[in-house]
Amino acid sequence: MIYENAPAKINLTLDTLYKRDDGYHEVEMIMTTVDLYDRLTLEKRKDKKIVLKIEHRYVPNDHRNLAYKAAELMIERYNIKCGVTITLDKTIPIAAGLAGGSSDAAATFRGMNKLFELNLSLKTLAELSSEIGSDIPFCIYGRTSLCTGRGEVLEHLPKPPSCWVILAKPEISVSTQEVYSALDLSQAHEQIENEKCRRAIEAGDYLEMIRTLGNRLETVTIEMHPVIQMLKETMMKAGADVAMMSGSGPTVYGLAAKERQAKSVVNALKGCCKEVYMVRMLG
């Protein structure tokens, strides 16, 4: 039996450069992980079935689930002769811009590597995982990274300066595909400061880092769901140092240097948002 944690991610930056011939967008973004986890247990089966056990009415337990796809790909690629039971304890909000599904898949790749004693490197797992999802290679490592290409080309960075992270997920779900479809790059004038953010992280400069956060998709998702702007404003009024949407949304995160600031933000959000988490960066 193998246990794996699957941490959520947040985007410190996210820029979309152009739409590629393969239909994906070329991106440049800095992501890190936070200590909000799904937890997976993996056990060998005597038969050849993949059984995904999960008690969540909105999360599928078949090939529509990335963790299931990861198990399927590992069994096929490495000619594994038996099946696997994966028990998934879900904590990360779904369709939230926190890569919960991708992180579950990454944990499945890592877990099956251990369970079946394949001795594959993280680099090999990351390359394999890119076949089923663009964020999964990042989640394989779980380290702060500058991500390019579809998101699968990684350059690892140091852990960001220490701070508190407040996550607020409104009672809506967002389709990443829908957000990208609505993105008009000809109208995208905001400068996303990836290089400045990177340098701030490398220097351990918190104040410079928060000045350089940015998300190209934020205005698109806010137009669809104004509650995101309301959450950002609530966080800032309550004392957050910065507030930003993660990924394609709808989760908004705030950063706070001090614990009392973070607690003030959490208290301010309680009246308007059911899913609020106060966490730390792992990266």
Swiss-Prot record:
The keyword Magnesium does not apply. It is an enzyme of class 2 (transferase). It comes from the Bacteria. It catalyses: 4-CDP-2-C-methyl-D-erythritol + ATP = 4-CDP-2-C-methyl-D-erythritol 2-phosphate + ADP + H(+). The active site is at K9, D135. SUPFAM superfamilies: GHMP Kinase, C-terminal domain, Ribosomal protein S5 domain 2-like. Gene3D superfamilies: 3.30.230.10, GHMP kinase, C-terminal domain. Pathway: Isoprenoid biosynthesis; isopentenyl diphosphate biosynthesis via DXP pathway; isopentenyl diphosphate from 1-deoxy-D-xylulose 5-phosphate: step 3/6. The keyword ATP-binding applies. Coiled coil: none annotated. ATP binds at P93, I94, A95, A96, G97, L98, A99, G100, G101, S102, S103. Its EC number is 2.7.1.148. One of its GO terms (molecular function) is 4-(cytidine 5'-diphospho)-2-C-methyl-D-erythritol kinase activity. Pfam families: GHMP_kinases_C, GHMP_kinases_N. GO terms for biological process: isopentenyl diphosphate biosynthetic process, methylerythritol 4-phosphate pathway; terpenoid biosynthetic process. Keywords: ATP-binding, Isoprene biosynthesis, Kinase, Nucleotide-binding, Transferase. Catalyzes the phosphorylation of the position 2 hydroxy group of 4-diphosphocytidyl-2C-methyl-D-erythritol. NCBIfam families: ispE, PRK14608.1. PANTHER family: 4-DIPHOSPHOCYTIDYL-2-C-METHYL-D-ERYTHRITOL KINASE, CHLOROPLASTIC (PTHR43527:SF2). Belongs to the GHMP kinase family. IspE subfamily. This is 4-diphosphocytidyl-2-C-methyl-D-erythritol kinase. It comes from Macrococcus caseolyticus (strain JCSC5402) (Macrococcoides caseolyticum). The gene is ispE.
